[in-house]
Amino acid sequence: MYHIKHDKRAESSVELICTAVLELLETKPLGEITISDVQRRSTVSRSTFYRNFDSLEDVLALLCDRGFDEIAAGSGAPVYIRVFHYWFNNAAVLEALVRTGRADILAESLKSCCFARRSCRAWTKRGWTTSPRTSAML
């Protein structure tokens, strides 16, 4: 699980880490990338990596979550076209997940994105008559 604080320094470190992972994926399969590789490429300390992520897979989960957030925020083209367009342009993450048998990360990210939007719409239709916690459990 990733756990990122919302301050400029943490967000800057996270961007460096994400960029490093994407760059490393261009030359190595995910299974061969180490935290030390990411640390060297990103110039952030090992402790900074672990302050924000528990594993390399968590970096990919964040990238997936960001992708689905971007897809959901888009407009114009039907959502399925936006999905294919996004992943066509961001194939490194998708390939890394599929090659390592971790498509579950992608599926979980998609489920979280869709669930949140569907839950909010349903809560709105019910006139906010249930608590946020109860609505999330439905």
Which role does the model predict for each range below?
Residues 20, 52, 62:
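Residues in the recognition helix of alpha-helical DNA-binding motifs
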Residues 33-34, 95-97, 106:
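Short, hydrophobic secondary-structure boundary micro-motifs
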Residues 34-35, 63-72:
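Short, basic, alpha-helical segments at the C-terminal edge of helix-turn-helix-like DNA-binding modules
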Residues 1-6, 46, 73-92, 102:
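Primarily secretory-pathway and cell-envelope proteins
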Residues 77-85, 101-137:
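Amphipathic alpha-helical packing segments from all-alpha helical-bundle domains
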Residues 43-53:
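Short hydrophobic/aromatic patch on the recognition helix
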Residues 1-28, 32, 37:
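Basic, helix-initiating cap at the start of DNA-binding domains
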Residues 32, 55-60:
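Short amphipathic alpha-helical segment with a characteristic S/N-K-E followed by hydrophobic residues
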